[in-house]
Amino acid sequence: PNKMIQKENVYLVGDAATQVKATTGGGIIPSLKAATTLCDCIINKKDYNKEFKKQSGRELLLHLKIRNVLNKFSDRDYDKLLGLMNQEKVKKILKKYDRDTPIPLVLNLLLREPRFLLFSKFGF
């Protein structure tokens, strides 16, 4: 997320710019968003580094933080997580919110099921 993605007239987009969701490895949506941002920056002479971070930096950083937490899980922790995820109230949230935008997803999960906070012991 702190990678420089523009230097003079050279621009990085997608995997080369680390614009991937660390939780899933997916990069199509972030890459398309970045390409749209880059077009706007070139046309309007804006700083692509700054504009991309403003638009998508927080979301990709949260994906990375979630991945770092999941990497510390034991099998027992995954069992607890799946137990929480299997509740109807949680399933409704998962259907409503897109995993490409984890901030509203995580906030709503925490509001509806505060026991997700137990996983914060792994660090955020």
Residue ranges and their predicted role:
Residues 2-4, 9-11, 29, 33, ...:
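Structured catalytic cores of enzymes that bind and process phosphorylated ligands/cofactors
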Residues 5-23:
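Short FAD-binding loop at a beta-strand-to-alpha-helix junction that anchors the flavin cofactor
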